[in-house]
C-alpha cells in the first residue's frame, strides 16, 4: 500500500535553479527573527522538571515542553563536546533557533580521534558521506573504559553551563555506544560491539553501567557548583538508548552464533551470553511454571528432563504453542523490568537523581511495541525514535511523506504514547538527501502539538570546530548546516513550544489484553506499525491518540468515516492526498499558518491568512507571529519558504534514490519563487519582507508588498532566501 500511495507524483511545475545559501552559526548575531524569546533562562531556575498527570511540569507548576536537538559529532569538522569558545557561540545559536533542550548523546564513546570513513566506498570515492565516530568522554589510552578524559570533561562542564545560561536544558543518555575493553573484565568483550541487549543481564556490564552513571551524575560541575544529579537544568536521564532484550528476541538475535571468525550476520548473542540467558530462563521456569507445564514445554522443545530448555528462534514464533511462547515472552519482559527497576533504584536512591527517568525508547516500528510498553510504562516518561526512510533500512528513500499520511512518522510515533505518561520524541529526522526534507519540521511540530506531546529532539546537531568545517551538509543526519531545516527551526518552535497549534479536543484510547500483546509479538511486519487489526490509522491525524492500558480489558476505537482531506478535530490542521498524490498539509491557527507539500498542484487550497502562487513543484511555507499577537494583527512575523537542498555538485543515482557523489561546499537551495499572499491583515497600510541569509542576517533591500483584493502579495525568489522578516505598518 505504501508503494502505491507514493507512486504517483505530480509533474514538475517548473525547474528552479539551485543557488548557494550557506549557514554559518559563528557569524549569526541576535536578530528580530530569532525565537530565543520562547526560552526562560537560566534553565532550571523554576526548579526540577517533573512528570505528573501525563505531562512534564516545571517546578513553578507551569507546563514544560522541549524543542530540542541531539548533540553528536559524526560529520567531519564536528565535535559533540565543543571547545569553550565554540560552546559559547553554539549555545547562543541554539537559543536563537528556539531550542530549549539538548540530548547529550554518545558521551560514553572513546575520546580518541577516529579515522574518517566513506560510507559510500562501494559506489565510488566521492559517494560519501565522510564521517567519523563521535569523540566522547572515555579515555581510549587505557586498557579499560572506566576513566574520563579530564579535558573533555571540563569541556562538557563548560558546555552545559553555557547551555544553562541560555535557557537550554540537558538530557543525559547513559548507555549509548560504549565499547567495553579487555580491562573491564567483561566476557567476550571483543565480540560485543556496543553490547546491546547484553547490558540487561550480564552482571559485569550492569556493574559497569552503574559505575559510569555514578561518575557522570555525581560529578560536580565547577562552572555551576552543582552535581549533575542536583542540577535542575537536567530535565531527564535515559538509561539505555535503542536497546531492548525483547527486540533481540523478536528479531532472532538470540541465536548464540557470534564467535571469533564466524559469519556473525547481523546482531546476535555469543555462546557465553546465550548460555547465561538460557540458565536464567530455566531458573525462571522453575519458579513461575508448574511441573506439568515445564514437562509440556520440554516436550515442545524436544529436550529431555535435566537438559536446559532453549529459547526459540524467531522463525518458530508464529506456530509456537501459546504455553511455550508466552513463557518466553514473560521471562524476557521480566529481565527487562528487573534491570530497569534496579537501575531506577540506583539512580534515585544512591545517586539522588530527581528528574524523570526513561528506561528506553520505542525505536523499531516494524515490530510490535505492545510487549515493550510493559517496560516503558514502568518509567516516568515514554519516548520514541523514528526516521522517514532511514538510509540503513530503505534502498529507495526519496519519496514524499506528505503523500502517505497513514504511513507517516506521526503514525509511527503516536503508537508509543499512553494515557497518564508524558511523551517525548528523542530522535527524529528526514535524513538527507531528500527532495522532500522540508516537510518534516512543520508537519511534525504541528501534529505533535495536536497530540499534546512533551518534547521533540531532532537527530542531530553538531557543533563545528573553528577552521575545520565547510558550509555543506556533512552526513545523512546532521542538520546543523542544512539551510532549510535551520530556517524552519524557529518556526517549528513557535508552532510546538509556544503551542500555536491547539491540542486535540477529543482523546481516543485503545487497550490490550495479555493475550493480544502475545499475539502482536508474533504478527508479521505487514501489520506495522500498530499491530492492532482494525485500528483506524487516521485517528492520530484527527484526534488525540493514546494507549489506555495494557494487560487489561481490550478496546479499540471505532473506525472513523473516510475523508480526504483528513481534518483535525480542532479544524487547525488538514492533510489531503487526492488518492496518494499531490499531498498537502495545511496549518491554520491564530498564531501560525502553513502550507506544506505540492502547493502548485493545490492552488485553491489556502489558509485564513496565507496563500501561495509559486513555480516550485514542492515547498514548505510557514508564517508565524513574532510578537505574540494573532497573525491578522501582528506587526512582526517570520515567513519561511523552503524546498530542495543539495550540496554543490551532488549526483543522484538513476533512480534518484541515493547519491553517487555527496557533493561539496557550498550548500545550495531551491529558492521558492513566485508570490506569497498575506491575507486579512487588519488595518495594514504597508507590508514589507526582509530576505534573510542562512545565518538570519538581512540580505538585500526589503521587498515591498503589493496590495491586492484579499490582502497583500510579496514576490519571493530574488534574492534567494529561505526566511523573511515580515514588517507590517498599520
Where are these regions (language model features)?
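N-terminal pre-domain segments of enzymes
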Residues: 14-46
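Catalytic-core region of carbohydrate-active enzymes that cleave or remodel glycosidic bonds
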Residues: 163, 339-356, 365-388, 398-569
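C-terminal beta-strand-rich structural cap/linker in extracellular carbohydrate-active enzymes
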Residues: 623, 708-730
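Surface-exposed loop/edge segments in extracytoplasmic proteins
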Residues: 695-704
Amino acid at each position: 500500500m505504501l508503494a502505491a500511495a507514493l507512486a504517483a507524483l505530480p509533474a514538475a511545475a517548473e525547474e528552479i535553479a539551485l543557488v548557494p545559501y550557506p549557514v554559518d552559526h559563528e557569524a549569526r548575531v541576535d536578530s528580530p527573527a530569532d525565537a530565543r524569546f520562547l526560552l526562560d533562562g537560566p534553565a532550571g531556575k523554576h526548579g526540577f522538571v517533573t512528570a505528573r498527570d501525563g505531562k512534564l511540569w516545571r517546578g513553578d507548576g507551569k507546563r514544560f515542553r522541549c524543542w530540542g536537538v541531539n548533540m553528536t559529532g559524526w560529520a567531519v569538522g564536528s565535535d559533540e563536546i565543543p571547545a569553550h569558545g565554540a560552546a559559547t557561540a553554539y549555545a547562543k545559536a541554539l537559543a536563537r533557533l528556539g531550542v530549549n533542550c539538548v540530548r547529550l548523546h554518545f558521551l560514553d564513546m572513546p575520546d580518541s580521534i577516529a579515522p574518517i570513513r566513506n560510507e559510500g566506498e562501494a559506489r565510488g570515492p566521492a559517494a560519501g558521506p565522510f564521517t567519523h565516530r563521535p569523540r566522547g568522554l572515555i579515555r581510549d589510552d587505557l586498557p579499560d573504559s572506566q576513566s574520563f578524559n579530564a579535558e573533555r570533561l571540563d569541556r562538557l562542564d563548560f558546555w552545559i553551563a553555557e547551555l544553562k545560561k541560555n535557557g537550554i536544558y540537558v538530557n543525559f543518555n547513559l548507555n549509548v555506544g560504549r565499547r567495553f575493553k579487555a580491562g573491564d573484565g567483561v566476557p567476550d568483550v571483543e565480540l560485543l560491539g556496543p553490547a546491546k541487549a547484553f547490558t540487561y543481564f550480564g552482571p559485569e556490564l550492569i556493574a559497569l553501567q552503574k559505575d559510569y552513571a555514578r561518575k557522570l551524575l555525581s560529578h560536580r560541575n565547577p562552572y555551576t557548583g552543582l552535581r549533575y544529579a542536583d542540577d535542575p537544568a537536567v530535565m531527564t536521564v535515559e538509561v539505555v538508548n535503542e536497546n531492548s532484550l525483547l527486540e533481540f528476541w523478536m528479531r532472532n538475535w538470540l541465536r548464540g552464533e557470534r564467535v571469533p571468525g564466524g559469519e556473525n550476520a547481523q546482531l546476535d548473542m555469543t555462546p557465553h551470553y546465550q548460555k547465561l540467558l538460557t540458565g536464567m530462563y530455566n531458573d525462571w521456569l522453575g519458579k513461575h511454571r508448574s511441573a506439568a507445564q515445564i514437562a509440556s514445554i520440554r516436550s515442545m522443545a524436544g529436550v529431555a528432563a535435566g537438559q536446559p530448555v532453549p529459547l526459540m528462534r524467531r522463525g518458530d514464533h508464529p506456530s509456537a504453542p501459546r504455553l511455550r511462547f508466552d513463557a518466553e515472552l514473560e521471562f524476557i519482559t521480566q529481565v527487562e523490568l528487573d534491570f530497569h527497576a534496579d537501575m531506577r533504584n540506583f539512580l534515585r536512591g544512591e545517586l539522588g537523581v530527581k528528574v524523570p527517568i526513561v528506561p528506553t525508547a520505542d525505536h523499531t516500528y516494524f515490530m510490535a511495541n505492545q510487549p515493550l510498553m510493559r517496560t516503558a510504562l514502568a518509567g516516568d516518561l515514554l519516548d520514541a525514535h523514528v526516521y522517514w526512510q532511514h538510509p540503513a533500512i530503505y534502498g529507495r528513500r526519496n519519496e514524499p511523506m506528505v503523500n502517505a499520511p497513514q504511513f507517516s512518522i506521526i503514525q509511527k510515533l503516536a503508537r508509543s504514547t499512553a494515557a497518564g505518561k508524558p511523551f517525548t520524541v528523542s530522535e527524529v529526522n528526514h535524513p538527507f538527501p531528500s527532495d522532500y526534507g522540508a516537510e518534516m519540521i512543520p508537519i511534525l511540530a504541528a501534529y505533535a502539538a495536536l497530540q499534546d506531546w512533551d518534547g521533540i529532539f531532532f537527530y542531530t546537531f553538531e557543533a563545528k570546530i573553528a577552521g575545520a568545517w565547510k558550509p555543506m551538509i556533512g552526513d545523512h543526519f546532521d542538520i546543523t548546516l542544512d539551510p532549510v531545516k535551520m530556517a524552519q527551526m524557529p518556526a517549528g518552535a513557535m508552532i510546538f513550544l509556544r503551542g500555536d497549534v491547539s491540542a486535540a479536543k477529543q482523546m481516543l484510547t485503545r487497550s490490550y489484553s495479555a493475550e493480544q500483546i502475545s499475539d502482536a509479538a508474533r504478527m508479521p511486519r505487514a501489520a506495522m506499525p500498530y499491530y492492532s487489526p482494525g485500528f483506524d490509522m487516521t485517528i492520530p491525524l484527527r484526534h488525540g491518540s493514546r494507549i489506555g492500558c495494557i494487560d487489561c480489558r481490550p478496546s479499540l476505537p471505532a473506525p472513523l468515516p473516510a475523508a480526504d482531506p483528513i481534518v483535525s478535530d480542532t479544524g487547525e490542521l488538514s492533510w489531503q492526498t487526492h488518492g496518494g498524490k499531490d499531498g498537502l498539509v495545511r496549518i491554520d491557527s491564530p498564531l501560525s499558518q502553513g502550507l506544506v507539500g505540492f502547493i502548485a498542484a493545490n492552488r485553491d487550497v489556502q489558509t485564513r491568512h496565507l496563500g501561495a502562487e509559486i513555480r516550485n513543484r514542492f515547498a514548505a511555507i510557514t508564517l508565524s507571529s513574532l510578537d505574540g499577537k494573532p497573525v491578522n494583527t501582528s506587526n512582526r512575523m517570520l515567513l519561511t519558504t523552503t524546498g530542495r537542498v543539495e550540496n554543490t555538485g551532488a549526483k543522484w543515482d538513476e533512480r534518484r534514490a541515493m547519491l553517487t557523489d555527496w557533493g561539496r561546499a557550498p550548500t545550495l537551495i531551491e529558492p521558492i519563487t513566485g508570490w506569497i499572499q498575506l491575507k486579512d491583515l487588519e488595518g495594514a497600510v504597508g507590508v514589507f519582507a526582509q530576505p534573510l541569509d542562512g545565518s538570519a542576517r538581512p540580505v538585500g533591500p526589503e521587498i515591498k508588498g503589493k496590495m491586492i483584493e484579499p490582502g497583500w502579495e510579496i514576490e519571493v525568489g530574488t534574492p534567494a532566501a529561505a526566511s523573511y522578516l515580515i514588517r507590517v505598518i498599520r
